[in-house]
Regions:
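Short proline/glycine-enriched turn/loop segments at secondary-structure junctions
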Residues: 805-807
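Glycoside hydrolase catalytic-domain context in secreted enzymes
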Residues: 32-800, 811-823, 839
């Protein structure tokens, strides 16, 4: 970080330069023409004229300033009242976030005030006793940053902790006032409102995106996005860093729960629904009740070779084009206003340095005219971590020329200085600067910020309303998954229930990361009005019938996986008074690098708790509350029922109580493959040749992939029968639309919803085909005895694959379509090979 005039960089951040904690505590906020492709969003001539007029009057300094995004923390200071540092807590925090021992010891030798100055802006507990954190905006600093450096975007919540609507109104209105005064261009303020207004107190939090994937209901995705947009605008925030469509195909990755699961079609359909909900029906004219989206993280961020956050991916060209690119392509075509870029590399190329992926694939091939923003300080990573640039200036040159339009450089204006040097030296052309700024201005005009820089106040009376709460509850009910039921559910009232496990009585586990704070920790005071699982079950079954003895609890002063010494004997003793045991197990909240793990197995303490309770002879219902599928193969056989609630949000406990009691019916299905063992982490669309198992000789071609439960699996209190699977044609060619119909009947005695999934299999291909691929899905509701006919319109080109030559190919031959257990065969009569990158 360059040392500038003191009114530019707060001294605490200059000192923090050498402290690697800043890096490990980083936040996710997260074009020319080619082909005869129409723009993803049809251009509005009047709006484009305004963009050109504004661009024509801007100086180089103003243009470069628009390309910089700063963290709000740099414009103020966090004061911690009654602060006395607990050095053991400081040591624990530094160790948790990976600070080197040498840096840790150096910090511990500093005075209390020096430690507070360096760490007070972060949502970590390093204090003795009770404290109160107060953040104040420095108007002089804000003046300088906007008047001198022309900063065009600001992000984040102070200390990454949710603020009130009134605070957001005060801060953003002042920012907009300064922006319009000094440069005549409004700021575009961004927040990680990922599953509701996560950084705004009193708003509506929804289940995490992985739950939306489990619901298989795109209408829920759109509704949740509409509500989040409304409540974001109530807080005066016009831009959200969402949706997330990183395919979660490695269960070790700490951000599995932030996407819609492992399948590209689920992610693609959900992202389109969310973009429509967030932005409304006209992305050229987004009204005051909708927001701009930043679809992220473009792309393959969720495929780290090591399973660790922000580490390299190594993928075949076919896998990239067919699967990892697909949701982002659909997001671009749906008009997402912006995209955020993957922090890591793919096949040795950092995404922030890839002209092919950033400019050619997105801006040229798709004619997408939004802007690309980096993730947290990721241009710096090109020289500090990826080693493809010699210094920061070189990294800026590489990234901007590759296609990056806005740099999230949280604590420094050095970007502006170095980029100006690059332009003056001819290393970055003025045409590239103009292209980037034009895209940023386009987003601001589309959001209506020039005409109405601020929103909120009158017209936003539904903020945090019961109406919105009901939508969140419905999403939770439709996304919690019944994985096993040996006749114990619905659970009759009047029984004594032992409620145990570390997730039984904590809101943090239910709302997950990006909830009030970055890690979702130390925010219990902001979620007190919602019900934990314990409180929800007390409301449903009567407090006198619920015995709470957790046996294992989380250590809130440690890492997300830290647990106190177990007290399993107490839980076993309490089981004597119970008729049934509900064990709430899983994970505490986390996100990003702090959520890395070294062992996919559920913690030994929790598994030992279940094993000990099994010996009591009382039936056990396992409730899994987790952001990724932790291995439970040794305890699943001990359970009479298993429910996976994933991360269901503030109404997840209420939803679970309704479902366990039979007042609502399960309809969720797994959005990922649940593995049984660490050496079998296949996804559902594995190659047939990947099937492995116990060898019955030299080879066993009848072996299957080892898994706990398959993708798309989920039970209900009723049963559904599929019949009459038909297609309107048995032979087809590439330009055909295949109409697929199937009858679905509710054959049980309870009303229920069913996600209907359409799969295809290519029986023989010139490269090894996937064993099956999801092609479409929908969700229906059926009364007992009711039958509905479901219709899918399947474009034949969707059955194509990327061949060895990199071209889309549909080969003649046999295909099988499957819905439920029903199959139908169809035949492609002619091979077609496309010369275009997208079909």
């Amino acid at each position: 970080m360059l040392s500038l005039h003191p009114d530019i960089i707060i001294q605490q951040f200059v000192t923090m330069k050498k402290n690697l904690l800043m890096a490990v505590l980083g936040l996710i906020s997260i074009g020319a023409q080619a082909q005869d492709t129409k723009p993803a969003i049809p251009r509005d001539a009047a709006l484009e004229a305004k963009i050109e007029k504004t661009l024509s009057r801007m100086t180089l300094d103003e243009k470069i300033g628009q390309m910089l995004e700063l963290n709000l923390d740099v414009m103020g200071k966090m004061t911690v009242e009654n602060a006395k540092v607990d050095r053991e807590k400081v040591r624990s925090v530094l160790q948790q976030y990976g600070a080197p021992p040498k840096e840790t010891e150096a910090l511990l030798k500093m005075t209390d005030q020096q430690i507070i100055d360096r760490l007070s802006n972060y949502p970590v507990d390093i204090y003795q006793g009770e404290t109160r954190r107060v953040w104040q905006l420095n108007e002089t600093m804000l003046d300088t940053l906007i008047s001198k450096w022309k900063v065009g975007s600001i992000l984040n919540a102070p200390g990454t902790r949710a603020a009130t609507v009134d605070q957001w109104q005060q801060w953003i209105r002042l920012i907009q006032k300064k922006s319009m005064k000094y440069i005549g261009i409004p700021d575009i303020y961004g927040l990680d409102h990922n599953h509701g207004v996560t950084y705004t107190q009193g708003g509506t939090l929804f289940p995490q995106p992985i739950n939306l994937g489990a619901s298989f209901n795109t209408e829920l995705a759109r509704t949740g996005a509409e509500i989040t947009a409304y409540e974001s605008r109530a807080a005066n925030c016009p831009w959200v860093y969402n949706p997330v469509v990183d395919l979660s195909r490695d269960p070790r990755w700490p951000r599995v729960w932030e996407s819609f699961g492992e399948d590209p079609i689920v992610n693609a359909k959900m992202v389109v629904a969310e973009i429509q909900g967030y932005q409304g029906d006209d992305p050229n004219h987004i009204d005051r009740f909708h927001v701009g989206t930043s679809t992220k993280h473009y792309f393959a961020y969720g495929a780290p070779w090591t399973g660790k956050d922000r580490t390299p991916a190594y993928l075949s060209p076919q896998m990239i084009r067919e699967k990892y690119f697909e949701p982002f392509k659909q997001a671009a075509l749906a008009g997402t206003l912006t995209m955020m870029v993957n922090s890591a590399s793919v096949n040795g190329v950092p995404l922030h340095a890839s002209y092919e992926y950033l400019t050619k694939w997105l801006k040229e091939d798709l004619q997408w005219d939004g802007f690309l923003v980096t993730d947290w300080a990721d241009i710096n990573n090109l020289f500090t971590r990826e080693k493809v640039a010699k210094d920061k200036k070189d990294a800026i040159r590489i990234a901007i020329n590759a296609g990056i339009d806005m740099s999230m450089d949280p604590y420094s204006v050095e970007f502006c200085i170095l980029l100006k040097e690059l332009v003056n030296e001819g290393q970055v052309k003025m045409e590239r600067i103009d292209d980037a700024v034009r895209r940023i201005l386009r987003a601001k005009y589309r959001l209506g910020l020039f005409d109405e820089p601020n929103t909120g106040g009158k017209g936003y009376e539904k903020f945090g309303s019961d109406e919105f709460a009901k939508a969140s509850l419905q999403t939770a009910e439709e996304s919690e998954i019944l994985l096993k039921n040996e006749g114990i559910l619905p659970l009759a009232k009047g029984q004594k229930i032992l409620l145990t496990g570390p997730n039984a009585n904590q809101m943090r586990c239910l709302h997950g990361g990006w909830s009030y704070t970055w890690q979702g920790s130390r925010a219990e005071d902001l979620s007190e009005k919602y019900n934990t699982i314990y409180e929800a079950l007390c409301n449903k079954y009567g407090e006198e019938n619920i015995i709470l003895e957790q046996g294992v609890t989380y250590n809130e002063d440690g890492a997300y996986y830290a647990e106190h010494a177990p007290e399993i004997d107490k839980a076993v003793a309490a089981a004597d008074k119970a008729d049934v045991i509900i064990a709430c197990i899983g994970e505490n909240s986390y996100t990003e690098t702090p959520g890395n793990l070294t062992d996919l197995w559920l913690s030994e303490n929790q598994r030992n708790l279940v094993k000990a309770l099994y010996k009591t002879g009382k039936p056990i219902i396992l409730v899994l509350n987790e952001g990724r599928p932790r291995l439970i193969a040794d305890i699943e056989p001990l359970a009479t029922a298993v429910v996976d609630i994933l991360i269901p949000g503030n109404y997840g406990g209420d939803a679970l109580a309704n479902l366990l009691a039979g007042d609502a019916n399960f309809s969720g299905k797994l959005p990922y493959t649940y593995p049984r063992e660490i050496n079998s982490l296949n996804t559902y669309d594995y190659k047939v040749s990947e099937e492995v198992g116990t060898m019955a000789g030299a080879y066993n071609y009848d072996a299957k992939v080892s898994l706990q439960w398959p993708f798309g699996y989920g039970l209900s209190y009723t049963t559904f029968e599929y019949s009459n699977l038909k297609t309107d044609k048995t032979h087809f060619t590439a330009d055909d639309i295949i109409t697929v119909t199937v009858d679905v009947k509710n054959t049980g005695k309870t009303a229920g919803k069913e996600a209907v999934l359409l799969y295809s299999s290519d029986l023989v291909a010139s490269i090894v085909p996937d064993n099956r691929r999801l092609r479409d899905f929908t969700k229906i509701e059926l009364q007992p005895g009711e039958t509905k006919t479901v219709t899918f319109l399947l474009p034949a080109k969707d059955l194509a694959f990327v061949g060895a030559d990199g071209r889309w190919t549909l080969e003649e031959g046999d295909f099988i379509l499957k819905v439920g257990k029903r199959t139908v065969s169809i035949v492609c009569d002619a091979t077609k090979v496309w010369d275009t990158p997208n079909i």
